[in-house]
């Protein structure tokens, strides 16, 4: 049976109380990957996958999930500023559907609006060279996406969200 694909808050009801999550920033050429610790407080970068064919990309993601013993995925969904979904969001949903056919780990979709831009500004502020930014931007965007999702889930648990 394929994995569930749900908005983050709904997906969280299908994840065990503890267990890490894999966060993904899906680009056309790369996939930024981050993971959380088991109590879901902190996101850290893992790697940037150079996209090849879906099966190869998915195999690497599933290997990371197995190595880290995670309980689900958080996939950044690129929503337009007006709240609509354009071609990138549709492509992300298609990727999620294809990944869901290969795993039972629930997939939570999280609004990633402006995540890459925010990370780019942060890296520029840290005086990271353009070449180095290009190497790390997607992994850092995955960290940003996953940490935002973790913070939202923490706020819901404490009644602040």
Curated annotation (Swiss-Prot):
The keyword rRNA-binding does not apply. SMART domains: YqgFc. It is found in: Cytoplasm. GO terms for biological process: rRNA 5'-end processing. It comes from the Bacteria. It is an enzyme of class 3 (hydrolase). InterPro entries: RNaseH-like_sf (IPR012337), YqgF (IPR005227), YqgF/RNaseH-like_dom (IPR006641), YqgF/RNaseH-like_dom_sf (IPR037027). One of its GO terms (cellular component) is cytoplasm. Keywords: Cytoplasm, Hydrolase, Nuclease, Ribosome biogenesis. The keyword Cytoplasm applies. Its EC number is 3.1.-.-. Disulfide bonds: none annotated. One of its GO terms (molecular function) is nuclease activity. Pfam families: RuvX (PF03652). Belongs to the YqgF nuclease family. PANTHER family: POLYNUCLEOTIDYL TRANSFERASE, RIBONUCLEASE H-LIKE SUPERFAMILY PROTEIN. Could be a nuclease involved in processing of the 5'-end of pre-16S rRNA. HAMAP family: Nuclease_YqgF (MF_00651). This is Putative pre-16S rRNA nuclease.
């Amino acid at each position: 049976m394929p994995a569930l694909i749900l908005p983050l808050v709904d997906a969280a009801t299908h994840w065990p109380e503890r267990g890490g999550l894999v966060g993904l920033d899906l680009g056309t050429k790369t996939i930024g990957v981050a993971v959380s610790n088991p109590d879901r407080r902190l996101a850290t970068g893992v790697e940037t996958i150079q996209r090849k064919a879906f099966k190869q990309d998915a195999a690497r993601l599933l290997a990371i999930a197995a190595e880290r013993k995670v309980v689900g995925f958080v996939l950044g969904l690129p929503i337009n500023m007006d709240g609509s979904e354009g071609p990138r969001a549709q492509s992300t949903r298609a990727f999620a559907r294809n990944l869901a056919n290969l795993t039972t780990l629930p997939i939570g979709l999280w609004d990633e609006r402006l995540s890459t831009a925010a990370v780019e500004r942060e890296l520029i502020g840290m005086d990271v060279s353009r070449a180095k930014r290009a190497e790390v931007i997607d992994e850092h965007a995955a960290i940003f996406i996953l940490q935002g999702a973790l913070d939202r889930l923490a706020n819901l648990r404490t009644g602040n969200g």
